[in-house]
Amino acid sequence: MRIAVIGAMEEEVRILRDKLEQAETETVAGCEFTKGLLAGHEVILLKSGIGKVNAAMSTTILLEKYKPEKVINTGSAGGFHHSLNVGDVVISTEVRHHDVDVTAFNYEYGQVPGMPPGFKADEALVALAEKCMQTEENIQVVKGMIATGDSFMSDPNRVAAIRDKFENLYAVEMEAAAVAQVCHQYEVPFVIIRALSDIAGKESNVSFDQFLDQAALHSTNFIVKVLEELK
């Protein structure tokens, strides 16, 4: 099976890249694509760059050029739910934009005109990730909503404003909704799997720098388990 894995930063893709066999890397429009073999699958690893525009552009190139059957978006995120700690892993059930507001025209908050309010992760991929959850003993793995915006959520006031909009939000980051929206339009199944590098609004910038590598390791190890289970 041909599986695409997307991470925004070098720290988020480096560990998985090192695990690929027969790896070949090429750069298209400034985006790094590495093809290789892992767990019996052909894997295309994309380093997309940070933010929604980079994520949307590179995911479009990925789907047009490499035509993966499924897409997994990995990397770090800021924890939003009160039950979460740094290092925990969140599996998306749904992804939304948290910085889109066209409510003046009767759209839901976060809804892009012409698009659904949120983008549902593929049920089979979520179920597979849930199965892998049961093998994790040292970290907490949960599933829930992830929201995306082009800002790092370190300001407690901004965090509080987002909480008012989304009651059951588990994590925030800067690429997933763009990846999900492109996959939705191309009808390619996707899931987002993110490990927490910080807790949104609580000295997030300090925590991010300190725990990014740990988050990358946790998310990568979990994705390898998913690939091993994927048939």
From Swiss-Prot:
One of its GO terms (biological process) is nucleoside catabolic process. It is an enzyme of class 3 (hydrolase). InterPro entries: MTA_SAH_Nsdase, Nucleoside_phosphorylase_d, Nucleoside_phosphorylase_sf. Keywords: Amino-acid biosynthesis, Hydrolase, Methionine biosynthesis. Substrate binds at G78, M153, M174, E175. Pathway: Amino-acid biosynthesis; L-methionine biosynthesis via salvage pathway; S-methyl-5-thio-alpha-D-ribose 1-phosphate from S-methyl-5'-thioadenosine (hydrolase route): step 1/2. It catalyses: S-adenosyl-L-homocysteine + H2O = S-(5-deoxy-D-ribos-5-yl)-L-homocysteine + adenine; S-methyl-5'-thioadenosine + H2O = 5-(methylsulfanyl)-D-ribose + adenine; 5'-deoxyadenosine + H2O = 5-deoxy-D-ribose + adenine. Its EC number is 3.2.2.9. One of its GO terms (molecular function) is adenosylhomocysteine nucleosidase activity. The active site is at E12, D198. One of its GO terms (cellular component) is cytosol. SUPFAM superfamilies: Purine and uridine phosphorylases. Catalyzes the irreversible cleavage of the glycosidic bond in both 5'-methylthioadenosine (MTA) and S-adenosylhomocysteine (SAH/AdoHcy) to adenine and the corresponding thioribose, 5'-methylthioribose and S-ribosylhomocysteine, respectively. Also cleaves 5'-deoxyadenosine, a toxic by-product of radical S-adenosylmethionine (SAM) enzymes, into 5-deoxyribose and adenine. Belongs to the PNP/UDP phosphorylase family. MtnN subfamily. This is 5'-methylthioadenosine/S-adenosylhomocysteine nucleosidase. It comes from Bacillus cereus (strain G9842). The gene is mtnN.
